[in-house]
A protein has these predicted regions:
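Eukaryotic scaffolding regions of large macromolecular assemblies
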Residues: 1-219
Length: 219
């Protein structure tokens, strides 16, 4: 299911011949599924178990963000947004699932820049908080990295399993099946069918938001 979502997200983002109707239909389906998922399962976040339990949520959310990064202009409907995508993202980023933390970092950072520029949702305060939490976690592990009797019990094996599972989860989120292959002849054949990031990125790639620049200065 995760791989299928990655293929859908990458294809909808990159395929040049798709109509607006087709793109909005897929986005509408994803937003409906994600909204329902949050309503039904958000309380489970407070229960025991790793966040990889919700990998289908993160794969679907990341696919939608990836689509939005490439197709955000098509989501505009006058003064409003198709699928009420602005209200949707505003709800999702503050959910207990915290997708800005657990989805692919590069995709989330680019989504945050575009979403802020388009007035959809502001993400950088949450990203900063996530980074601070991660830093505190790393420092805490360094302080507690001392021999103890607990290291010989099942606790260490549980922790090791969690680390392995988390790495597999992160690796899975980093798969983009329709990322470009730099083959000159093939590229000429595909230019009428394939959207390069440079076709839609504008200044987003080179000009990070002022907020993010300030955030980096403080870290």
């Amino acid at each position: 299911k995760v791989k299928s979502l990655q293929y859908i997200g990458s294809f909808i983002a990159r395929a040049k011949k798709l109509s607006k109707t087709q793109i909005i239909f897929v986005a509408s389906y994803l937003t409906s599924w994600l909204n329902r998922y949050v309503l039904e399962r958000e309380d489970e976040v407070d229960q025991s178990g790793g966040m990889e339990r919700f990998k289908h949520f993160y794969a679907a959310f990341q696919a939608l963000c990836y689509i939005f990064c490439f197709r955000h202009s098509l989501f505009r409907d006058g003064d409003s947004w198709e699928c009420e995508i602005d209200k949707f993202f505003q709800r999702m980023v503050i959910s207990k699932f915290n997708p800005l933390k657990f989805c692919n970092e590069n995709v989330m950072m680019m989504f945050a820049r575009i979403a802020q520029h388009e007035g959809v949702v502001y993400c950088f305060s949450i990203i900063e908080n996530n980074n601070n939490e991660r830093l505190r976690g790393i420092m805490g592990k360094a302080d507690s990295n001392m021999p103890s009797s607990a290291s010989s019990t099942g606790t260490s094996s549980t922790s090791s399993w969690s680390l392995v599972a988390r790495q597999q989860f992160i690796d899975l989120q980093s798969y983009f099946p329709y990322d470009p292959l730099f083959l000159k002849n093939y590229k000429r054949m595909m230019r009428d069918y394939y959207i390069e990031w440079s076709d839609v990125s504008g200044d987003y790639e080179s000009d990070e938001s002022d907020e993010y620049d300030e955030m980096n200065k403080d870290t």
